[in-house]
Amino acid sequence: MNYASELLKTTESRESYNLFFRSLRVNHILAQVYWFKAESGARETSDYENAAKYAALATEGVETLIPVTTAGLNAVMANNDASYPGLYMCGTTYGATAGIYGSTWYYMGYNPNNVPVNPDFYALFTPEDIRYDAYFMAPGILANSWPDGGAYGSKNGNCVLFKPEEAYLILAEALYHTQGDAVGTLNKFKSFRNAGTANGLSGESLLQEILNERRKEFFADTDKRWLDLKKYGGTISRHLTFFKKTYDITVDTDAYQYALPIPLDELQQNNAISQNEGWVQIEF
């Protein structure tokens, strides 16, 4: 990616040839890489500085393109905002059912109604936040129109890559870790969402506010929440029921589940590697 970044200085970017070979997106990817690497086993002292550098580059010229209304948020998720700099991607479940979002057949009655969200997640919002009406139709209840504001909400698992909002939040977090103006950057992001300010926050309270904004902004957005939990050592608890059997599952900070299993085809093609600790081979 660093080579691609250098190449962009002398080579014209053509989206008709490659959607990823564009300065804004290459810088965004580099910001993501250094952001996650900074808390990994491969971390280096310069990681957050690099994350801040590339995140700042990924926010250049995008401020006026970020939606500041609920209707604007819905337009992005429906791919109806041609000026939005993110890259809209249709999920492979398009036209079928998607486990993350629910059912695409809601209009036929095949979809759960009045789905509750985690109470502590709901408590992060104020009604003035533009995401509130996009996410909820009643206190603590997921809106049927989510995520795109349509009559039934498109539940195809589509997503938007390279959201400029993510670049702002990476920048705020990186500046927090490098004693930069994290509050100012976070306030800029909050202004897009009418979500108050971070004035007066410092230390762990400021970091938690940044993580809270990530949690709110990236609700059910690919694996972002999972990466945050993995990055900062969160504990996951779930009470699940399958075929009338209940399971209480807790994934602790150092649990093996945070290192995902290596796919079977990779194990079969490379006998020099072994499955990650804790995972057992399932044969069908």
Regions found by a protein language model. Give the residues of each.
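Acidic/polar-rich alpha-helix caps and helix-coil junctions
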Residues: M1-Y101, Y122-F284
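Short, helix-capping/interhelical loops that line the mouth of catalytic, cofactor-
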Residues: T104
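Aromatic (Trp/Tyr) and acidic
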Residues: Y107-G109
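Acidic/Gly/His-enriched mid-domain segments of enzyme catalytic cores or analogous surface patches
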Residues: P112-N118
